[in-house]
Amino acid sequence: MFLTDPISDLIVRIKNANQRKHKTVEIPHSNKKEAIVKLIKEEGYISSYSVEGSKKTDKRLLVTLKYKGKQSAIVGIKRVSKPGLRVYVKSEEIPKVLSGYGTCIMSTSKGLMTDKEARKANVGGEIIAFIW
């Protein structure tokens, strides 16, 4: 299956699994997807992730979602920059998600990072997604 936007596929799979209260979700692997999942893990929205499979074509990300009782750690996740409409911001214009309670995942010249890291490094870039 050919995907025009693999990042949106990642976000939708996590969102759907989260809404259905699944413990884990399986996602086709790519280095960029793995970097995004790593940031989500570091921010505390998922419990863990692992890379399954040995061949490049068989690799999958196995993401374990995080719950506190019946409440999910992820309240919402939204794709911002899309292939048809890219969203770029300068370092001074980086938005705060829910007044700082959420996280903005950005692709910068220094790699993928959160909004807090981008402000600290004083770099702008493309806004990939919001998560809260």
Swiss-Prot record:
Keywords: Ribonucleoprotein, Ribosomal protein, RNA-binding, rRNA-binding. GO terms for cellular component: ribonucleoprotein complex; ribosome. It comes from the Bacteria. GO terms for biological process: translation. One of its GO terms (molecular function) is rRNA binding. Pfam families: Ribosomal_S8. Part of the 30S ribosomal subunit. Contacts proteins S5 and S12. One of the primary rRNA binding proteins, it binds directly to 16S rRNA central domain where it helps coordinate assembly of the platform of the 30S subunit. PANTHER family: 40S RIBOSOMAL PROTEIN S15A (PTHR11758). Belongs to the universal ribosomal protein uS8 family. This is Small ribosomal subunit protein uS8.
